[in-house]
Amino acid sequence: MKHLPEQDAQVFKAIQLERKRQQDKIELIASENFVSEAVMEAQGSVLTNKYAEGYPGKRYYGGCEHVDVVEDIARDRAKEIFGAEYVNVQPHSGAQANMAVYFTILEHGDTVLGMNLSHGGHLTHGSPVNFSGVQYNFVEYGVDKETQHIDYQDVLEKAREHKPKLIVAGASAYPRQIDFKKFREIADEVGAYFMVDMAHIAGLVAVGLHPNPVPYADFVTTTTHKTLRGPRGGMILCREEFGKKIDKSIFPGIQGGPLMHVISAKAVSFGEVLNGDFKTYAQNVIDNAKQLAETLLSEDIQLVSGGTDNHLVLIDLRSLGITGKIAENVLDEIGITVNKNAIPYDPEKPFVTSGVRVGTAAVTSRGFDQEAMKEVGSIIALALKHHEDEAKLEEAKKRVSDLTARFPLYNELDY
């Protein structure tokens, strides 16, 4: 960085400290990743200066001929990756992508069937503290109490009983594959639209390592970060027949000008997905998650559903006698970043929880392999089992430092 250190030392210092935190700690928050330098360069480009309300070829501002090219590249690449008929890359976030779909097909008070937040769903799938739960009549489905897999019979029975206008599949803390075909069949039986929020698994879907919802769903929403390893943002994929309505819901419906610098970064990251190396990366993400799960289980740490099919693992802490809030703080002290997370049928409050969610997308981008994940799992088990033993925690902290030193991050950055 050339100008920021002199112009704004306070902000520069905070950025430096965050850079150091990312280097010195093991990032296991399942919704985070490390983008490439090329993605960061695109996002920090002169495109941040350009207003471009509207869509390519139909803008409300002049001078959009070059940003039109960028947005078309992003849309075309997304279509190619996911086999979608229509794509909108303008949503600023996954939440706004979901909002746009709801505004396209729902009226205030319509019934929607979505996954219970504490069972792995998302705030925008009907939580009463979110706009979705305020605007619409959400009915919740969840996971089976024994298997902790989605209870498709429960989904079917609730769909038959409540006749929702929309069924939402997808999750923020569900470690198993989702059967989109079953959801489609249920939606067809009751005459509902079907939407999939694939924010967490989009990178796995992109290269065929998780079933693709696009052939089954009327609408698919996603973030562009997480396993897709792009900039923070959202995207909607849908059938051609809904394309113009979706566009109108985004602009002028819920957004004004698109963030063209972010859309350029989306285009770059989609280009990276189309590179053959991305499939190897995504497979390593899954392999690392499975190795982490296996190591934790071998240490008698309980996992929701007993393991994982994707990038995330949900740890059930009840047998250890600690809460998610305590575990998050303990792990942060030794240099491992996670988030407390509710588990199915959780007796604790949302800000306390009985679980923590961990994911392998970021550490895999950093180069961690399965041997490294064995060590990570061993360190987590040590810290959680001995969370009040300062000597054990110091040992764990040293092992974290040894690991992070082996896998440097962003070597070419000059700050």
From Swiss-Prot:
Its EC number is 2.1.2.1. Its cofactor is pyridoxal 5'-phosphate. CDD domains: SHMT. One of its GO terms (molecular function) is glycine hydroxymethyltransferase activity. GO terms for biological process: glycine biosynthetic process from serine; tetrahydrofolate interconversion. Pathway: One-carbon metabolism; tetrahydrofolate interconversion; Amino-acid biosynthesis; glycine biosynthesis; glycine from L-serine: step 1/1. One of its GO terms (cellular component) is cytosol. PANTHER family: SERINE HYDROXYMETHYLTRANSFERASE, SERINE HYDROXYMETHYLTRANSFERASE 1. This is Serine hydroxymethyltransferase.
